[in-house]
C-alpha cells in the first residue's frame, strides 16, 4: 500500500540511528499502531533492508543505513544527553512554526523530536533532517543545496547558501563542536561557521543545542557571538558564562 512505502525511509532513519528499534517505539515515532508497523517492515525484511527480531527491528550488517560512519558515530555519542536536549528544544517549537536547522548529531535528534509537531515549515542543509521531517503530514521541508557531503549528507554549496539567505523563519536551531571559554561557540570547518551565521541571520530566535561535554573545549572556527535573546540548551548545568544568551537546562530522559 502507498502509505506503507511512505514510512519506510522513517524506519531506515530510526534503525540507522540506533541499530535496533522496538516495534512499540516505531509505532510511537510514526504515530501508527503496532500492527501497522509490522505491515510497514514486512516488505523491508523481505528485501533484506532490515531484520526482524523478537519485538524489534534491527539493522542488517553491511546494509546501507542513514549517512556514513562518522555521522552515525556522532549520533551514538552522548545519546541520552542529546535526546534530552532535543525534547527541550521541541518544546520551544509550536505547530505551524517556521524554523531552520543546521547539520549535526544533536540537531538530528531535534528533528526526531519534532516529528510529533504538525504544519512545520523547515529549512535545512541536512538530508537526514529533511527526510526525517518531510513525510509528516502538513509539513513543508526545503532542502538547501544540491551537492551532499559523503560523511554526513549535508550540503554547503552556493545553492545551499542562496536558499537559506532568501528565507525568513522564527527559530534557528544550531549546533556547535565546542564552547570555548573565551571565544564562545566554535566549529571545525569554515563552511559550517558560514552556514550557521547565515541561518542565524534569517531567524527571530536562535537556539544553540549543545551537550555539556562541549563546554570548555575549543575548535578551529568561531561562530557568531551569542546575543541577547539567544538560548543555549544543554543537558545539565555547567559552569559557563553564556551571557548575554540564556542557558536552558533540559531534564534527563
Task: Give, region by region, the residue ranges found by the protein language model.
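Conserved phosphate- and dinucleotide-binding cores of soluble alpha/beta proteins
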Residues: 2-13, 17-24, 31-33, 46, ...
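HTH-adjacent hinge/linker in prokaryotic transcriptional regulators
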Residues: 2-100, 111-116, 134-138
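Glycine- and other small-residue-rich loops at beta-strand/loop junctions that grip anionic moieties
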Residues: 78, 99, 122, 153, ...
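A general structural motif
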Residues: 96, 117-119, 203, 229
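A glycine- and small-aliphatic-rich helix-loop capping segment at beta-alpha/alpha-beta transitions
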Residues: 115-120, 190-191
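Short, compositionally biased
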Residues: 119-122, 247
Amino acid at each position: 500500500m502507498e502509505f506503507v512505502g511512505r514510512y519506510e525511509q522513517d524506519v531506515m532513519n530510526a534503525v540507522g540511528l540506533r541499530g535496533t528499534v522496538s516495534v512499540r517505539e516505531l509505532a510511537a515515532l510514526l504515530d501508527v499502531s503496532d500492527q501497522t508497523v509490522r505491515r510497514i517492515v514486512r516488505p523491508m525484511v523481505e528485501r533484506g533492508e532490515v531484520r526482524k527480531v523478537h519485538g524489534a527491528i534491527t539493522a542488517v550488517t553491511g546494509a546501507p543505513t542513514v549517512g556514513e560512519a562518522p555521522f552515525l558515530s556522532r549520533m551514538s555519542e552522548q545519546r541520552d544527553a542529546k535526546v534530552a536536549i532535543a525534547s527541550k528544544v521541541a518544546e520551544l517549537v509550536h505547530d505551524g512554526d517556521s524554523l531552520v536547522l543546521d547539520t549535526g548529531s544533536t540537531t538530528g535528534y531535534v528533528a526526531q523530536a519534532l516529528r510529533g509537531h504538525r504544519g512545520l515549515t523547515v529549512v535545512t542543509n541536512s538530508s537526514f533532517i529533511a527526510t526525517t521531517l518531510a513525510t509528516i503530514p502538513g509539513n513543508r521541508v526545503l532542502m538547501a543545496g544540491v551537492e551532499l557531503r559523503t560523511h554526513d549528507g549535508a550540503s554547503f554549496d552556493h545553492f545551499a547558501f542562496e536558499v537559506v539567505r532568501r528565507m525568513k523563519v522564527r527559530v534557528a536551531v544550531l549546533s556547535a563542536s565546542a564552547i570555548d571559554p573565551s571565544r564562545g561557540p566554535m566549529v571545525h570547518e569554515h563552511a559550517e561557521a558560514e552556514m550557521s551565521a547565515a541561518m542565524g541571520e534569517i531567524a527571530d530566535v536562535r537556539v544553540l543545542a549543545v551537550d555539556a561535554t562541549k563546554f570548555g573545549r575549543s575548535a578551529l572556527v568561531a561562530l557568531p557571538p551569542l546575543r541577547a535573546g539567544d538560548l543555549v540548551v544543554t543537558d545539565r548545568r555547567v559552569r559557563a558564562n553564556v551571557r548575554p544568551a540564556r542557558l536552558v537546562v533540559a531534564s534527563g530522559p
